[in-house]
Amino acid sequence: MEHKLEDIIAIFNQCFEEEYNTRLVKGGDEPIYLPANDEVPYNAIYFARGFYSSALHEIAHWLVAGKERRKLEDFGYWYEPDGRSEERQRDFEKVEVKPQALEWILATAAGFRYFASADNLNGNPGDTQPFKQAVYEQVKIYAEKGLPKRAETLRKALVAFYSTEDDINLAKFDVTCI
């Protein structure tokens, strides 16, 4: 199955451009979310380096962000670049569990391979297994309780486009493979 950037951009924009004034945009080296302003009249999710996986990851952050956070650059997240200590890495991972669980669900809906991201290439991520397990536990919660409205809208659109199974089947989520 081929995953084209034009497709994920079109799917996202069809789902959310009108109601949320938000577009998915191929960006440069670093991803960023910028709310609408005087120069750009729409909210923009810029994903990095033309990677499909980056698009899914940045979308997941947008899906987690509430209405007020979507008014802030990068949703008001603190970000500490690569080279984080193991302790700071654990703090980083706490805010990544829900977005990465959604990213995994969306990737599965698109028939795309998901890999958990410690996003700390120049630092010591330490043992990432507890983080991966936490992401899996959040997937289980979403499977049981349902996805937030915007996430479910996009999941359904991906399922329709890629002709994948229309449910969150936990048998397709193997924490040892991420």
Curated annotation (Swiss-Prot):
Keywords assigned: Monooxygenase, Oxidoreductase
EC number: 1.14.13.-
Annotated InterPro entries: EpmC
GO molecular function: monooxygenase activity
Reactions that this protein is recorded to catalyse: N(6)-((3R)-3,6-diaminohexanoyl)-L-lysyl-[protein] + NADPH + O2 + H(+) = N(6)-((3R)-3,6-diaminohexanoyl)-5-hydroxy-L-lysyl-[protein] + NADP(+) + H2O
Chain's role: Is involved in the final hydroxylation step of the post-translational modification of translation elongation factor P (EF-P) on 'Lys-34'. Acts after beta-lysylation of 'Lys-34' by EpmA and EpmB. EpmC adds an oxygen atom to the C5 position of 'Lys-34' and does not modify the added beta-lysine.
Protein family: Belongs to the EpmC family.
UniProt-recorded name of the protein: Elongation factor P lysine hydroxylase
Organism: Haemophilus influenzae (strain ATCC 51907 / DSM 11121 / KW20 / Rd)
